[in-house]
Amino acid sequence: MTIAALIITYNEERNIERCIRSVLSFADEIIVLDSFSTDRTADICRSQGVNFIQRKWEGYSAAKNYLNEQCSSDYIFSIDADEAPNKEMQDHLVELKSGQMNGVYSVNRITNYCGKWIRHSGWFPDVKIRLFPRGS
C-alpha cells in the first residue's frame, strides 16, 4: 500500500518544513497545494522536493478535493501545514503500510493555543479522520 501526504498552505514558512519532514518516513508522495503565499513557503517546499502546486483559493473543501484528485497513492494522509505527527505515530504508519490497511483511520489531535496544550473543555481528544483510501 502507498500513502500520499496532502498539505494545504498559505504563508506557512514557519511550519511547512517541519510538517514535510514529519511525513517523510511513511509518505510515498507529498503534495502541497499553495494559494500563492507571499512569504517563503514556495521556496521551502521546492527545496524539499515535494510536488508543489499553486492554485487560487476556492475554499477548504474544494482545495482538499483538488488535492485528492492529484495523487496516485492508495491512501491519503491529510495533514495541516502546522501539524506534525510525532515519532510514535510515524512509526505506526510505517508499520501499518507493511500490513493490511483497511478502512478509515482517525487520530487524537491535541491543540496548542498560545503555547499551551489544551487538554480540557472537550478540546482533547480532538478526533480527526486523517488517513483514508483515495477516492473515498
Q: Where do the model's predicted regions map?
A:
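Conserved donor nucleotide-binding strand/loop of the catalytic core
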Residues: 42-70
